[in-house]
Amino acid sequence: MIKLENDWDELLKDEFNQPYYLKLRQFLKNEYQTKRIFPDMYDIFNALKHTAYKDVKVVILGQDPYHGPGQAHGLSFSVQKGVQIPPSLQNIYLELHNDLNCEIPNNGYLIPWADQGVLLLNTVLTVRAGQANSHRGQGWELLTNRIIEMINQKEEPVVFLLWGNNAKEKLQLLTNPKHIAFTSVHPSPLSASRGFMGCKHFSKTNHFLEQNGIKPIDWQIPSI
């Protein structure tokens, strides 16, 4: 039984008993037993564990987890302490520096964002080592779409940051006029220069939150 230790438990309990999820669970059980899978089994739902539904102010959507050793720990774009900062996150930090004058930290551990209400959600929550997108189409997308739909139903305004075509596909799930979505190309080095750099999404997010009487995010990740 999955225990998230916050309000997500009640919200998702029916979802975890749906046929698609039970099938996904069986697939994962076999994958974890026979192959190297990231993140660690106990880290899969860290995004939900660190950011309760009631606390969600911002959603940053990723695709699937990092597939290198020691990187993924259940939050989009974040890596574990002591691991080299991946290129996409380097570009996120560069944009934060240019946008809000944040100092570029020496780590990619984004838990301080999650603890302030930034849900760092990948649309697929597991991956085989070294094989990007290897767990696509197994059922994760149904669950994460449901999570996005639930956040869409929130009364309190939420900012959605949708970077790249995969994330932008989720715009169709966002029907609540109280929320706002900012879109751009992905921060990957392959595309960042075509519109991510200079997007100012972080200052725009805080401006929107403040306009709605919500405490803004302190985007500065401390160096360790």
UniProtKB/Swiss-Prot annotation:
Taxonomic lineage from the root: Bacteria, Bacillati, Bacillota, Bacilli, Bacillales
PROSITE patterns per the UniProt record, alphabetical: U_DNA_GLYCOSYLASE
Active site: 64
Organism (species): Listeria innocua serovar 6a (strain ATCC BAA-680 / CLIP 11262)
Keyword tags: Cytoplasm, DNA damage, DNA repair, Hydrolase
Function of the protein: Excises uracil residues from the DNA which can arise as a result of misincorporation of dUMP residues by DNA polymerase or due to deamination of cytosine.
Catalysed reaction equations from the record: Hydrolyzes single-stranded DNA or mismatched double-stranded DNA and polynucleotides, releasing free uracil
InterPro entries documented for this protein: UDG_fam1, Ura-DNA_Glyclase_AS, Uracil-DNA_glycosylase-like, Uracil-DNA_glycosylase-like_sf
Family indicated by similarity: Belongs to the uracil-DNA glycosylase (UDG) superfamily. UNG family.
A biological-process GO annotation: base-excision repair, AP site formation via deaminated base removal
Entries under HAMAP family matching the protein: UDG
Name under which the protein is recorded: Uracil-DNA glycosylase 2
Gene: ung2
